[in-house]
Amino acid sequence: MAKYNEKELADTSKFLSFVLRHKPEAIGIVLDREGWADIDKLILCAQKAGKRLTRALLDTVVATSDKKRFSYSSDGRCIRAVQGHSTSQVAISFAEKTPPQFLYHGTASRFLDEIKKQGLIAGERHYVHLSADEATARKVGARYGSPVILTVKAQEMAKRGIPFWQAENGVWLTSTVAVEFLEWPFMPAGVQKQ
């Protein structure tokens, strides 16, 4: 595997997230309904748009991404973002899955008032993203400011017929989380959920 610096890997990951999740048309590629893009076309279009992209760089980003944001097709000819899409070109068909008792959502404290009014909504994305552990949710929340972890009563939601899915990288997905299924983060540190 070729050597790339952290900035180059992070910049490439952000670029891939942008074109494979949100705006494939920005460089002239088309994704299929499952989010797949032909790798040769992606590289060519990225280079035409002025972005340095090679197969070796793609391989490194896919292999080293701690969040496993991207995956290759079984034949190695296509790549996709595993989840997080806002483009209408993509509608990945995830298998429905029974969630654990609790899941977690990391957000910033500045968003709490809005969440208390409307719950968690997907916004521009297709799904609300949830984590199986608080540490991951805290990292997600920290991207937006002072992190706050909301506990989602996932099994209670599932018992009421609200579906959940899990992406290849372990991220849990659901369409929305009503306020009644949220536990607010005003518990002492270290308190365990039953």
From Swiss-Prot:
Its EC number is 2.7.1.-. SUPFAM superfamilies: ADP-ribosylation (SSF56399). GO terms for biological process: tRNA splicing, via endonucleolytic cleavage and ligation. Keywords: NAD, Transferase. InterPro entries: Ptrans_KptA/Tpt1, RNA_2'-PTrans_C, RNA_2'-PTrans_KptA, RNA_2'-PTrans_N. It is an enzyme of class 2 (transferase). This is Probable RNA 2'-phosphotransferase. It comes from the Bacteria. Pfam families: PTS_2-RNA. One of its GO terms (molecular function) is tRNA 2'-phosphotransferase activity. It comes from Escherichia coli O45:K1 (strain S88 / ExPEC). Removes the 2'-phosphate from RNA via an intermediate in which the phosphate is ADP-ribosylated by NAD followed by a presumed transesterification to release the RNA and generate ADP-ribose 1''-2''-cyclic phosphate (APPR>P). May function as an ADP-ribosylase. PANTHER family: PUTATIVE PHOSPHOTRANSFERASE (PTHR12684), TRNA 2'-PHOSPHOTRANSFERASE 1 (PTHR12684:SF2). Belongs to the KptA/TPT1 family.
